[in-house]
Amino acid sequence: MRQSSTNPMTQPLILFDMDGTLIIQKWRPVATEFNTFHTSYKSVKDQMKEIAVKHGVPAEEVNALDRMAHIWNHTRRYVENHGYSEARIQTVIYEIGVPFMAEDRADHAVSELLPDTMAGLESLKRSGYEMGLVTTASRESYDRISSHIDFGCFGDYFRYSVTRDECNYIKPEPEPIHRILEHVGRDDFVYVGDTDHDAQASHAAGGLFVLINTRNYDVNTIKKLNPDAVIDNLLQLQYTLSGF
């Protein structure tokens, strides 16, 4: 599909991830394929698992999970499928979100705007693209960062944003993308992100996925992600979109 018009209703909606796509940690943790090795991440995951088990999730179901999003989603699915009341579900999710939120704050305290983020967003805006943001970060984190001068107030470019606080299930589940599509009233979109969870959510929601390779993935890892295109920075995105 080729979109050359500057009418935003004839161009795909462009959705962005935040961490690793628009901003990044100044001192990047070591990543091997899709897993990130960082001491604090392990501690957070252990805390999340302990909370899940405390609320009745079998330890054998969560102990093998090595991603925070997987722990979150599995716990949510378990309590929903086992007849927990809505009030109890909210308690479980709130408690599991406490260490998640602590990790948000720690990561963002040492994050910075990626080069070319603002120039790339401005170029897309001038060409008439409608843009939105879908992140696994909390609403508090997104609102603080996206409106801060140190991060270029990049939130000004997005009419809509969806964070984990508005969702039952988070990426790699497609729910966050489905929610923003419903808000905007669109079903044609391109999602720009840096992880396997971004790729999986985008494909599951029926969109195109553009990998921004800020993690320096090798060729084999990129193939596993199965992106529709690969860019190194956001200034390359508009040209890439012209080829869809």
Show the residue positions of the predicted features:
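Active-site neighborhood of HAD-like aspartate-dependent phosphohydrolases
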Residues: R2-A64
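Conserved Lys-Pro-Asp/Glu-containing loop-to-beta segment of HAD-superfamily phosphomonoesterases
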Residues: M9-T10, I170-A199
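Short, acidic loop-to-helix structural element flanking the phosphoryl-transfer center
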Residues: R105-L133, D143, P174
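Surface-exposed amphipathic alpha-helices with a cationic face
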Residues: L121-K125, L181, A199-H203
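Histidine/lysine/aspartate-rich catalytic loop segments that bind and position anionic ligands
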Residues: T135-K171
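Acidic, Mg2+-coordinating phosphoryl-transfer loop and its flanking beta/alpha structural elements
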Residues: V190-A229
